[in-house]
């Protein structure tokens, strides 16, 4: 479940047999989307010719702080604000009659890359997602980090990189997610004095696809926003590296459609500024930018 889209899939091992994507309307809550989610699941099962009795379970990859033991969403950051009040396991059992599993979305994406993708079989990995928000997750010494209160590894989007920065949805100021993610980039752009001189002013909604495209065409404001965001993401990557001591950093998410610009920039900044006397962190693009979380939550369903 993302801030912009909800992806739904039927997965067998590391293969997605059928999938669909719907608008999340996350600001309106999760409960109104549950009937449509059921409808899509039923259609996908029919398309794949799989009876519900053959399904191992249903897994949800959710933003926010997730207790995978009690199978509850504990806290969310504006997206799907009603989710902590919903007993999703009960909904799953009543709706489908199959076991239910849940995990944080960034952890799910990391599981997908760690088990099947570009971090396969590594023992120390961090993943950073660049999308509607900024997410992170970590594998240390071969273990997926969750922590006593289920926040270990996933707070990368809320590392402070500008203590005088804008107020974040989490209540802090200057989080990397506030400084450089899709949900706030329109506000950032419109706050710039020279915004009206930019072609960006012709668009009611600004995203990174537009910013990178106009930057490539020489728009000064787009170049400024692109470079400012690259610096913010690099600072976040370095913070994650210093916090979790990985061998591999995987970058994924919708913004990675511009990976040809993002990967070289972050790699150079990490090599220049990260304190890693043992050597260089291997920075890789995710193998499954759109489906890693589906594969990861399927792994949770199949392995508990």
PLM features: residue spans?
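Glycine-rich phosphate-binding loop plus the immediately following alpha-helix
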Residues: 6, 94, 102-106, 160-199
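Glycine-rich phosphate-binding loop of actin/hexokinase-like ATP-binding domains
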Residues: 120-179
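Glycine-rich phosphate-binding loop and adjoining helix at the ATP-binding site
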Residues: 26-38, 53-58, 64-124, 261-272
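Glycine-rich phosphate-binding/hydrolytic loop that grips phosphoryl groups
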Residues: 101-114, 256-304
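Phosphate/pyrophosphate-binding loops at sites that engage ATP/ADP/AMP, CoA/4′-phosphopantetheine
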Residues: 37-58, 99-100, 194-200, 237-249
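Short glycine-rich, Thr/Ser-proximal phosphate-binding strand/loop in the N-terminal lobe
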Residues: 1-35, 39, 72-75, 144, ...
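A mobile "lid/hinge" subdomain adjacent to the ATP/sugar-phosphate binding pocket shared
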Residues: 16, 177-250
């Amino acid at each position: 479940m993302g801030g912009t889209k909800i992806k739904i899939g039927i997965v067998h091992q590391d293969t997605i047999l059928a999938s669909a994507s719907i608008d999340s309307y996350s600001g309106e809550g999760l409960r109104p989307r549950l009937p449509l989610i059921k409808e899509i699941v039923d259609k996908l099962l029919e398309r794949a010719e799989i009876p519900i009795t053959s399904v191992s379970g249903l897994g949800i990859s959710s933003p926010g702080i997730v207790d995978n033991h009690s199978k509850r969403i504990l806290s969310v950051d504006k997206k799907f604000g009603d989710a902590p009040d919903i007993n999703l396991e009960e909904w799953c059992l009543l709706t489908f009659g199959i076991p239910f599993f849940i995990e944080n979305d960034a952890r799910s994406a990391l599981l997908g890359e760690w088990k099947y993708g570009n971090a396969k079989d590594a023992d120390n990995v961090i993943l950073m997602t660049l999308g509607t928000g900024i997410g992170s997750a970590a594998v240390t010494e071969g273990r997926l980090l969750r922590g006593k209160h289920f926040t270990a590894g996933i707070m990368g989007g809320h590392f402070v990189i500008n203590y005088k920065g804008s107020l974040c949805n989490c209540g802090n100021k200057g989080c990397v997610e506030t400084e450089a993610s899709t949900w706030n980039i329109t506000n950032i752009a419109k706050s710039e004095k020279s915004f009206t001189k930019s072609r960006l002013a012709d668009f009611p909604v600004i995203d990174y696809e537009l910013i990178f495209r106009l930057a490539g065409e020489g728009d000064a404001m787009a170049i400024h926003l692109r470079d400012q965001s690259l610096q913010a993401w690099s600072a976040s990557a370095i913070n994650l590296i210093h916090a979790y001591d990985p061998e591999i950093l995987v970058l994924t998410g919708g913004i990675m459609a511009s990976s040809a610009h993002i990967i070289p920039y972050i790699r150079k900044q990490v090599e220049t500024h990260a304190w890693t006397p043992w050597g260089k962190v291997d920075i890789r693009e995710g193998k499954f930018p759109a489906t890693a979380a589906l594969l990861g939550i399927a792994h949770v369903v199949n392995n508990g």
